[in-house]
């Protein structure tokens, strides 16, 4: 554990009981949870088979297994019980419940026959993530179901009312559940819900199984939905030793069913919850974190919680940039131009650049612009929604479309504080994907047929933390390309300018000498003839 900082060591070596580690962006969540596992085995003599660890993706589970096995080389992978919630529930039901079911991995086929099928499918998935018990009767009065419909339905792109949409969704949900039952199928949400039902309904099984589970570790705890949290509580019935690693500032899946008040819920359900914080960032330069910390300050103010800022010892002279485009086209062209400059002048590989979008439709439109430009290797670029980029990091990040009604998203009307807060946290997640170069791009247009204004989120950032670049209003759009942004401080720019000037002097001198040689050769030939 010599490589751990003091905050990480304090968390890893904590006593038994319920422990929460608030692990900020880039502060080593996976490292902390892997080291905790190893500490229990190597230092406390705990049997690894009595430790149960949960994460959210197969990739994350695999990475965690590989990290832990290196820390406890005397054990084998078979000794490690590290699962996604769904894979654990599937194994548990196969062994202790009805084992003749099949898993419906793709529900698209069922909903494809419905008008507005994609939206109806989303409602069903969100609702089933928000509950532990499915209530199919009186859905009109079910708050979780109504929330799922509200989160999904967008009146601006529909010919029906919100109420009509809820009725359609209720009909689709009942039909979907009947389809699953008739065909002996479970979807992923059912796996966890059924596991909870089985444990609650069989006290002997609950007692016997939880006797063997002495420690439970959960990664990305802030993304836990109600059924997953209920499962963790049930598994901790006999030995309530929980080690929960997460970041409340990265709660961006409330719309998908993650419990917004999960940390408060935990404190209500368990006594003497101990809290730890990790704030040393190993990803981003301090200039990027200064921008991130401004957003954290606003989040803390809204949530009325203690402010915990991130810090970094990574040195760089790069300065985050806010570019104010004067049109949507100008925004796209400027980003493309800057990507070329980063590659040519700063040596940043294209696969280490990312453009992050709030919506898929903006991603698709930008991809088309890149194709039309023809100079960038589209296959190497990382064009991602912010949700898809969570957990990733890149040398250079462009946050696209920081425009009111787009980011924050059009789907909220300002009345739901949780949604506005989640949008703000999404902005924070986008910023903290950047290792060295950060570009925040807004659009400002006011004309008879278009109106765009920069996102309110940009006002959260102190002016001295951003270098602002404004676009000129061209008579002919982009007749001349915008100049590349200065990414460094004035001192370094002066040094680069001097180097460039010296280089030009040598080039000019060489050209003069070459001309003299050519003239001499021509004169010699003339004289000889």
UniProtKB/Swiss-Prot annotation:
Q: Which PROSITE patterns match?
A: UVRD_HELICASE_ATP_BIND (PS51198)
Origin, by domain of life?
Bacteria
Q: Does the keyword ATP-binding apply?
A: yes
Residues that bind ATP, according to the entry? 23-30
Please state what the protein is called: Probable DNA helicase MPN_340
Where in the numbering of this chain does the UvrD-like helicase ATP-binding domain appear?
Answer: 2-285
One CC-aspect GO term:
DNA helicase complex
Coiled-coil annotated spans? none
One annotated GO molecular function is: ATP binding
Lineage summary: Bacteria, Bacillati, Mycoplasmatota, Mycoplasmoidales, Mycoplasmoidaceae
